[in-house]
């Protein structure tokens, strides 16, 4: 098993020999391999400019690698046209970003239910699942409230609930607690890790912070020659 591979069984995320360059002679990374199993959270750290966010965009099918392959739940992104990629993102991927992007004119329930509206017309079921996810992140009975009523940490909890409500195979997080104070960030990260594991998703989080990365099952460093396991 390579340093970037997780436990046995078919991974929910399988990346093989990935390479990406930027305009000019500079290569961000090459020979990148990564396997992430159900219920596993992997943190990828690295300095600014090494390609962490670019890697997430490739994993989400928003950007193309120069070489290699990405498969999500057994589906090779390279075999899909843009319409099929969009459908896969909506159905199988959840996103958590540093910016919360909670719409102020919608209730918290409606914000969390947004991914369901893209894949299912059943509004009653969507509301029920949104309320259940809000309960799961510690916002019991708050579905009828609005973003203005919440702290930064609570807003990120809403973002985590929204990322998980459609039961995705893969959760991608880009500096998910970068705007939070250290105590709030630690609580939100613990909640995020518990949610990923509890829902059986594969989680990939990129961060520059080793303290944030410590919550993960594996910590990998991204460099020009791929990923290196920080925990040996």
Regions inferred by a protein language model and the residue ranges of each:
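H-loop (His-switch) and adjacent beta-strand-loop-beta switch element
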Residues: 219-232
């Amino acid at each position: 098993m390579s340093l970037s591979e997780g436990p046995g069984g078919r991974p929910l995320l399988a990346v093989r020999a990935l390479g990406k360059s930027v305009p000019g002679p500079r290569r961000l990374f090459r020979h990148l391999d990564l396997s992430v199993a159900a219920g596993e959270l992997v943190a990828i750290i690295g300095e600014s400019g090494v390609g962490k966010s670019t890697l997430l965009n490739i994993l989400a099918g928003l950007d193309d690698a120069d070489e290699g392959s990405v498969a999500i739940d057994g589906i090779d992104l390279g075999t899909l046209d843009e319409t099929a990629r969009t459908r896969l993102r909506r159905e199988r991927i959840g996103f958590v970003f540093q910016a919360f992007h909670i719409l102020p004119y919608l209730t918290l329930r409606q914000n969390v239910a947004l991914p369901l509206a893209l894949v299912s017309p059943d509004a009653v079921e969507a509301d029920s699942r949104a309320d259940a996810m809000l309960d799961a992140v510690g916002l019991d009975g708050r579905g009828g409230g609005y973003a203005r009523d919440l702290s930064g940490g609570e807003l990120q909890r809403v973002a985590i609930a929204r990322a998980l409500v459609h039961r995705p195979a893969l959760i991608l997080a880009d500096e998910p607690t970068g705007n939070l104070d250290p105590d709030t960030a630690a609580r939100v990260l613990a909640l995020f890790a518990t949610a990923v594991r509890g829902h059986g998703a594969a989680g990939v989080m990129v961060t520059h912070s080793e303290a944030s990365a410590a919550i993960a099952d594996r910590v990998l460093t991204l460099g020009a020659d791929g990923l290196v396991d920080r925990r040996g």
